[in-house]
């Protein structure tokens, strides 16, 4: 799907400074001050328009959430949602996932969510997948020991390649489903893509993986 450019998006988000963090490097090691509490921080890498992260924030008010979305023209939809319905436990960043070490200290993030990431199906693009080993190393550097990644996708090949990459990295798998909606957990929060693919009859794959190093 072609991304529609919104030239006004960045200026709009900067006006919402209680939601959008324009320079998150200033908060490295100090996110508890930003949220004004010591609650755990969960991040979603590739938040899209924010259905998942805002849904999670409502369901778990005792957790702080940070939406990571590279594209300003997409992230602005999250900010707009929160202007209409404020959530004190969500912040939005427009940064590249490869730079997460610049914004979070080791152990400052309690969990990472990856939902319906770009599958980058061609072998020559494997390094761009958010479950490639270099990204796994980045997440490990901001998570605590035995930190977790929760991963959902509609793409079986991406799911299988992610299983292999995570296994080769030394991670263990605590929970897995090859058809999440066949027996959907009550606490599952769906993303925009999840709703769309489920309506088409496409199975949703999900796993929870833990670092063991």
UniProtKB/Swiss-Prot annotation:
Record's keyword terms, sorted: Methyltransferase, S-adenosyl-L-methionine, Transferase, tRNA processing
GO CC list: tRNA methyltransferase complex
Pfam hit, one: Methyltransf_4
Pathway: tRNA modification; N(7)-methylguanine-tRNA biosynthesis
HAMAP family according to UniProt: tRNA_methyltr_TrmB
Similarity-based family: Belongs to the class I-like SAM-binding methyltransferase superfamily. TrmB family.
Descriptive protein name: tRNA (guanine-N(7)-)-methyltransferase
